[in-house]
Amino acid sequence: MTQGLPAQPFNPIGIHAMTLSRRQFIQSSGASALLAGIGRQAWAQALDSAKIIAGFAPGGTADTVSRRVADKLHPGYAKSAVVENKTGAGGQIAIQFVKTAAPDGATVLLTPMSMLGIYPHTYKKLPYDPVADLTPVSAAAVFEYGLAVGPMVPASVKTAPEFLAWCKVNPALANFGSPAAGSAPHFIGALLGRAGNVDLRHVAFRGTQPAILDMIGGQIAAVCGPSGDFSQHLAAGKCRLLATSGGVRGKFTPGTPTLTEQGFRDLAFTEWFGFFLPARAPQDVVQRLNSGIRAALASQDVIDGLALSYLEVMPTSPAQLAAMLKSDTERWGPLVKAVGFTPEG
């Protein structure tokens, strides 16, 4: 079933670094100690306000992470924090905006790994350099992807292989949506179709929620996106989750089998969200923002709130985030080449 995919199993994205850093955080720094340490710092340079820039539509996973952290961002970093959604070009508009912002810490990027680790392999003229134009601050949360289908697909279809079989019989309806062309969900769907020898047509959207709305409205058959983005629609019975992308069943979706369980051994993926500042941001600003983000992510309200969207908090140091990005960028190159994606495609 996996004929034509890379010979060696593709490791889950970043899971090695993510699991270790989160364990280290939990073991080495409790929330109370962290907050106490922050309270002892001098906050004379606290900003009047800060903007967290998210590159996808309101209601999606990126928006959720941004708003949860903004609500709890330690007041020592900024007296207030707001979220601005700058959609377009698969998240590139948001990154360009932050790239050209003043490096004073007032403009913060929240982005999934895809925009920084995958796009360099898929766009010949990417308008930013993920390493040269941005300063890593902290990872925020880790999540897995899900494959869901809407009313276009018969209720008898309950698994990914059954979906592919239905697509073979109904080639005109064999399609799926993703939050952006060249994103991880795009490639997961493409690899799934390739593994099942199905011509699965991709439809790119500006975020997962617009794709889901078209799916539950019967305009497209399926959507591949962060599993948490489907939660409210699953609860309302408007769509069905056929598979998740983790190496093991998800903490928040224990009843849904993974793609690897269903025979697609190479399709095991997780992804992270990370906070970045513009290049040349002063180190004291980077460290203060890192401390503020860690404090926010240590809040039980944030932990519980992100869990509603199937997200697990995962704060890191700036160096850990930089290492994760480097590893994922290197890992995605061969996979993108295997799919044969081009910017025009």
Q: Which residues are covered by each model-predicted region?
A:
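Short, Lys/Arg-enriched N-terminal segments with co-localized hydrophobic residues
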Residues: 3-17
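An extracytoplasmic/periplasmic, membrane-proximal ligand-sensing/linker region
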Residues: 13, 45-49, 194, 261, ...
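N-terminal secretory signal peptides and thylakoid transit peptides that target proteins
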Residues: 16-33
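Hinge/capping helix and adjacent helix->loop/strand transition within the periplasmic-binding protein
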Residues: 100-106, 121-210, 259, 272-305
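A ligand-binding cleft/hinge motif common to bilobed small-molecule-binding domains
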Residues: 114-125, 191-195, 222-256
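C-terminal lobe and pocket-closing loops
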Residues: 142, 230-298, 327-330
